[in-house]
Regions:
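N-terminal hydrophobic/helix-forming segments and targeting peptides
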Residues: 1-169, 173
């Protein structure tokens, strides 16, 4: 019996953490949780600000439990002249934890573009300061997996300052 609950909890955890949901971009994760509560027989309510309320019932004094569904992420801070992007963190995201991570950029048109965060001068064999360079959001850039060599070409893909949310992908572990 205990392994049934554990397996269910692990399946739900995997499903939830794989839904892109940086702060301000949580509607899909909230819908998923709402549907799961409804499937269990509860009556979830999505608030006007996108929160989720679920009365679990019970007896005695009431108890309020709170949790958050959002994850860390970033947003486009600058479209650089070379077509790369400079990003700003959303939440407590730390630059030194993002280098070489795959990111998904969500355009307003619903298009998802992939890219990689890396040091601006990432050529270890020619950059003598590579290991000494502090990783900050001023020294990292996002290179899209698209052929762009200018700000105009990147903007033509639907990417611009402040409009595109970025989901920092976690490595897959099995």
């Amino acid at each position: 019996m205990q392994s049934t609950y554990l397996n269910y909890a692990l399946r739900q955890l995997e499903a939830i953490v794989n839904i892109p949901s940086p702060s301000g971009f949580t509607a899909e994760a909230v819908r998923y949780c709402s549907n799961e509560f409804a499937n269990m027989g509860y009556t979830p309510e999505i608030t006007p600000k996108g929160g989720l309320l679920v009365c679990l019932g019970g007896e005695g004094e009431g108890l309020l439990l709170g949790a958050h569904i959002d994850t860390l992420g970033a947003m486009v801070r600058e479209v650089k002249a070379n077509g790369a992007l400079r990003v700003a963190p959303v939440g407590g995201l730390q630059a030194n934890n993002t280098e070489t991570e795959t990111v998904h950029v969500y355009t307003r048109a619903g298009k998802v573009l992939e890219g990689t965060l890396q040091l601006e001068n990432a050529s270890v064999h020619v950059n003598g300061e590579y290991s000494k360079t502090q990783r900050t959001f001023d020294t990292l850039e996002l290179l899209l997996d698209a052929k762009t060599h200018s700000a105009a070409e990147t903007r033509a893909l639907g990417v611009d300052v402040g409009l595109s949310l970025i989901h920092i992908s976690e490595p897959t572990r099995h």
